[in-house]
């Protein structure tokens, strides 16, 4: 039978909790926090430990100090509106072990249970180490849930924070659950300002377990890596309506080597209506035959950010129909995608000049028409077209495109190559001298380039006598007024000729 035990840790009682039980740990104030050791309590790994907010605290701020190592089955707040501050002293470690659940599956490890009528419910780990483990991993296949969605039918906010002095280690895959109402997308927030590590070592082989931001039509969660955060994690899934933010100064490494993820899978998946905002540093180290990123939602790369994809796997980014990859980072090769961007009906937005300087842009046909929006004098390595691919390039104010090569051949059998009769390039808001190449291939069929205001089949390369290389230029279609003027002059001349006869 499950039991609930309420403990006032100022009472100096001696208590052993050895059966399945929920232990309520009553709070203290900032000047007089509640120390776990004062009660002389020992707990079994089957215990749920619950910081309990004491309404006697005048400001709603509740303080707990864990000053001994303990292992519990779950750590969760009650339903009050309060801020619960948890710190650990003398190297104390909180271990959350899912093994007592005794079966395969997904199990709550940290949970915020506040209900709507109590407003905000937050838990703040200010220092120390939290380990999430499965001590019976040879017997049970388990994953760990971090839940901010319990008792959350309304608009109450739930915030879980790990400050810069904390470390969260998980030997299990982590699932972050937000509140079950996407009308309030910012009310379920996890702030990770310290270290997050999901590695596990087996016989000397290290692998990193996955993290997933759970979301759907009715659920959403925001996970923030703060400016002091470091993360070493495995496959990362950002599901619908969820947001992952990487702040300036944060360092996030996604490593799927030894992870066993299936071939052709991505290392980072951004679903429809999901968002990844990168303002810090993101590095992806992939296992063989996997894609670095699959984008069905939105990725924004800020001006101080870097994205580095060079180590293992296919080393590419795939942007599908409905997906957008928006780049503002200013450093040369600050978005380094070793094996290129694949536009499969998706959109690439370039707001900086050199971020993609060494990257090839592949065009695929199976996603429909792909798009590039230019807002700067953007530099990339080359295009590579596949049969049936269509690309629209929008030249917005200040936008131009500079390529090392117009096209390159990709693959052993040349399945992606030059612009030919099976592909199409459309230029929007184009003027002559906005597309520059250092070199081009004779095989490129420039008659497959179309732009409003230019005669079809008129595009050609013109030598750039200042910078070297070549400009793409075409013959403009005469303006209607000019055409009318020419016709008028012709008619006048014809009439004069007839009079002379």
Residues covered by each model-derived region:
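Extracellular/surface-exposed low-complexity segments
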Residues: 21-58, 374, 394-477
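A short, hydrophobic C-terminal helix/tail in secreted or cell-surface proteins
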Residues: 479-497
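Glycine-rich repeat segments that build the extracellular carbohydrate-interaction surface of secreted
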Residues: 43, 48-74, 87-89, 95-98, ...
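Bacterial N-terminal signal peptides
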Residues: 7-16
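Bacterial N-terminal signal peptides that target proteins for export
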Residues: 1-6, 497
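The right-handed parallel beta-helix/beta-solenoid scaffold, focusing on the short coil/turn
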Residues: 61-62, 68-70, 76, 82-84, ...
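Membrane-interface capping segments at transmembrane-helix boundaries
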Residues: 499-501
């Amino acid at each position: 039978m499950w039991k609930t035990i309420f403990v006032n840790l100022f009472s100096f009682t001696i208590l052993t909790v050895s059966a399945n039980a929920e232990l309520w740990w009553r709070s203290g104030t900032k000047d007089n926090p509640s120390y776990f050791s004062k009660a002389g309590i020992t707990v079994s790994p089957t215990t749920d430990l619950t910081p309990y907010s004491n309404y006697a605290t005048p400001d709603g701020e509740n303080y707990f100090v864990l000053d001994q190592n303990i292992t519990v089955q779950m750590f969760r707040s009650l339903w009050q509106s309060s801020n619960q501050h948890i710190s650990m002293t003398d190297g104390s470690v909180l271990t959350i072990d899912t093994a007592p659940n005794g079966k395969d599956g997904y199990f709550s490890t940290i949970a915020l249970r506040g209900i709507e009528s109590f407003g905000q419910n937050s838990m703040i780990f200010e220092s120390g180490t939290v380990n999430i483990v499965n001590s019976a991993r040879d017997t049970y296949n388990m994953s760990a849930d971090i839940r901010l969605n319990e008792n959350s039918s309304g608009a109450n906010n739930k915030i879980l924070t790990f400050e810069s002095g904390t470390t969260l280690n998980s030997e299990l895959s982590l699932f972050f659950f937000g509140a079950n109402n996407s009308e309030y997308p910012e009310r379920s927030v996890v702030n990770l300002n310290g270290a997050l590590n999901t590695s596990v070592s087996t016989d000397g082989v290290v692998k990193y377990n996955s993290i997933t931001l759970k979301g759907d039509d009715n659920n959403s969660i925001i996970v923030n890596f703060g400016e002091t955060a470091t993360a070493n994690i495995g496959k990362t899934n950002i599901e619908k309506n969820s947001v992952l933010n990487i702040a300036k100064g944060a360092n996030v490494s996604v490593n799927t080597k030894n992870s066993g993820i299936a071939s052709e899978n991505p290392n980072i998946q951004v679903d429809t209506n999901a968002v990844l905002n990168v303002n810090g540093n993101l590095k992806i180290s992939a296992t063989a035959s996997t894609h670095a990123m699959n984008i069905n939602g939105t990725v924004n790369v800020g001006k101080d950010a870097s994205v580095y994809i060079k180590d293992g796997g296919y080393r590419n980014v795939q942007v599908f129909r409905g997906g957008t990859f928006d780049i503002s980072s200013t450093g040369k090769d600050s978005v380094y995608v070793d094996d290129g961007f694949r536009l499969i009906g998706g959109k690439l937005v370039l707001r900086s000049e050199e971020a993609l300087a060494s990257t090839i842009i592949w065009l695929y046909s199976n996603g429909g028409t792909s798009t590039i929006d230019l807002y700067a004098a953007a530099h990339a390595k080359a295009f590579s077209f596949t049969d049936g691919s269509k690309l629209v390039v929008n030249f917005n104010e200040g936008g131009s495109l500079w390529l090392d090569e117009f096209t390159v051949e990709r693959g052993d059998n040349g399945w992606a190559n030059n612009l030919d009769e099976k592909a199409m390039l459309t230029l929007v808001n184009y003027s002559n001298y906005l597309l520059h190449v250092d070199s081009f291939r004779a095989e490129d069929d420039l008659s497959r380039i179309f732009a409003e205001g230019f005669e079809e089949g008129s595009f050609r390369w013109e030598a750039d006598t200042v910078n070297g290389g070549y400009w793409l230029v075409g013959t403009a279609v005469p303006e209607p007024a000019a055409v009318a003027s020419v016709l008028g002059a012709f008619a006048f001349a014809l009439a004069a000729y007839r009079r002379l006869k």
